[in-house]
Amino acid sequence: HASNVTGNRNDLRRIGKICRETGTLLIVDASQTAGIFPISMKEDNIDVVCFTGHKSLMGPQGTGGLCVRKGVEIRPLLSGGSGILTFEKEHPSAMPVRLEAGTLNTHGIAGLLAGVRYLMEEERWKNFQKKELRLAELFYRELKDCPKFIFYGDPAGGLRVPVISLNLREEDSGE
């Protein structure tokens, strides 16, 4: 949905419309946008959304999720140890347990839930979005005319996340 390098954000509604018209499955990586920008699987014609919990959703590291539109078939990456049908030779076929091999990160999931609830209270996510975009804009505005910097992406563009990538012209980026 957005680049963690350039900060550019894609127009999901437009992309989703094209995908639906062409019968193309739309899988969205919302790692940079979940918790900052609203995403509607229905309105944006998204088939699958994956996200990380430790960024703007304020969950612990090691958390994340996969939202799958009903009717989309996903094969499990791992199987075994479901905890529900431990002694069966076949992994459960029902969702979501079909994709849950091994012991769930219950503490992490509880932490992610707490982060999401916090953001949803009083629509705090809107304030975070405005504040982070404002800080990124201020940072870019103060440095954009400095000849020492090379900026990547389109920091002044419309569809953005609060990420500014730059290099010092005279320095190796590996240093």
Show the residue positions of the predicted features.
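Pyridoxal 5′-phosphate
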Residues: 1-175
